[in-house]
Each structure stands twice: as structure tokens, then as C-alpha cells.
């Protein structure tokens, strides 16, 4: 797979740094907020990043939360991952949410708030059919593969008994 050419980036706010990687080899580049924001517990807000990009056709920009902020403060991205389509040329904005039940989150202009990853994507077409081929999974979804003790009926009953006891 060949490397992508450098991506054209327009800085809409000269006071905000161009996105960079925290460490060589990191997958994502850090995005910063252009404004001071205080998010109350449970509140969400759409913030600008001060940049616009020209992604090549066949790629997508994915906006992910910064893991340290999520773990330490509860700050996350509402529609994780956010999607930046190749044809979009406007300012990249990030819809943030404060998941902490008690503590407001204070962000200052220039704070790193999210990560942007650029990935190749398959541009597929769909064809309508009357029936899909059979698989061992079938229509099983939303927890059908198990893997978590609290999802088994016996474990749920035992947990209720332990709480009531």
C-alpha cells in the first residue's frame, strides 16, 4: 500500500496550531478548540477546530476522543467517531460531551480536544436482493456472542439475589 500524499490543510484561525502527532508513529493528529468552553455534567457542545482539509477521494477523516481526557475528565466525542467526508471543505467541528456526573469540564482556546485519523475507505455500491446468504451468525446481534458474565441469565439472577440479600 502506498503512502498518502500530504493533505492540503487550510488554517482558518491563525492562533490555533496546525494538527500534529504527539509522538512519531501515532495514528492520529491532535485537534484543538478555537474557543473557551465550560461543559456542565451531561452537556454537549459543538466546537470549532480552526482548520479545514481537502481529503482525497477514497479516504475518510475519523474524529476520536483523546483517551487521556476521556479517562481523567469524562470528555468524549458524541458521535464517536465523527466522520469527515472527502468532499467536505468546511471547518472541522467536534461535538463534545461531558460524561462526568458531577464535575464541569473547562476547556481553553488551544486545548487539544480530539484526534483526527485519516484512513482509506472502500467506496462500494449496493445491490438490492430478495435474500441474503446464510451464515453461522445469522441475524444474531447486540450481545448475541456473549463474552460477559453479567449478560448470562444465571449471572443476572445471582447478582439480583446478592443485592437483595
Curated annotation (Swiss-Prot):
Protein purpose: This enzyme is involved in nucleotide metabolism: it produces dUMP, the immediate precursor of thymidine nucleotides and it decreases the intracellular concentration of dUTP so that uracil cannot be incorporated into DNA.
User: Residues of the signal sequence?
Assistant: none
The Gene Ontology biological process annotation of the record reads: dUMP biosynthetic process; dUTP catabolic process
> NCBIfam families of this UniProt entry?
dut, PRK00601.1
- Report the pathway entry: Pyrimidine metabolism; dUMP biosynthesis; dUMP from dCTP (dUTP route): step 2/2
Q: Which controlled-vocabulary keywords does the entry list?
A: Hydrolase, Magnesium, Metal-binding, Nucleotide metabolism
Keyword field contains Hydrolase:
yes
- Give the lineage: Bacteria, Bacillati, Actinomycetota, Actinomycetes, Mycobacteriales
Q: Which residues bind substrate?
A: 66-68, 79, 83-85, 93
Q: What is this protein called?
A: Deoxyuridine 5'-triphosphate nucleotidohydrolase
Record region (Disordered): 134-165
Q: What domain of life does the UniProt record list for this protein's source? A: Bacteria
UniProt cofactor(s): Mg(2+)
GO MF, one term, reads: dUTP diphosphatase activity
Its EC number is 3.6.1.23
Q: Which species is this UniProt entry from? A: Nocardia farcinica (strain IFM 10152)
Gene3D superfamilies listed in its UniProt record: 2.70.40.10
Amino acid at each position: 500500500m502506498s503512502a498518502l500524499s500530504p493533505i492540503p490543510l487550510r488554517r482558518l484561525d491563525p492562533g490555533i496550531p496546525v494538527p500534529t502527532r504527539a509522538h512519531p508513529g501515532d495514528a492520529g493528529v491532535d485537534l484543538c478548540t478555537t474557543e473557551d468552553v465550560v461543559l456542565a455534567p451531561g452537556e454537549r457542545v459543538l466546537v470549532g477546530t480552526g482548520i479545514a482539509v481537502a481529503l482525497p477521494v477514497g479516504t475518510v477523516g475519523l474524529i476520536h476522543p483523546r483517551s487521556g481526557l476521556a479517562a481523567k475528565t469524562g470528555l468524549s466525542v458524541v458521535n464517536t467517531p465523527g466522520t469527515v467526508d472527502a468532499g467536505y471543505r468546511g471547518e472541522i467541528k467536534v461535538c463534545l460531551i461531558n460524561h462526568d456526573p458531577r464535575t464541569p469540564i473547562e476547556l481553553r482556546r488551544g486545548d487539544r480536544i480530539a484526534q483526527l485519523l485519516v484512513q482509506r475507505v472502500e467506496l462500494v455500491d449496493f445491490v438490492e436482493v430478495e435474500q441474503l446468504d446464510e451464515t453461522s451468525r445469522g441475524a444474531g446481534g447486540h450481545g448475541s456472542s456473549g463474552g460477559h458474565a453479567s449478560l448470562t441469565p444465571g449471572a443476572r439472577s445471582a447478582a439480583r439475589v446478592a443485592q437483595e440479600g
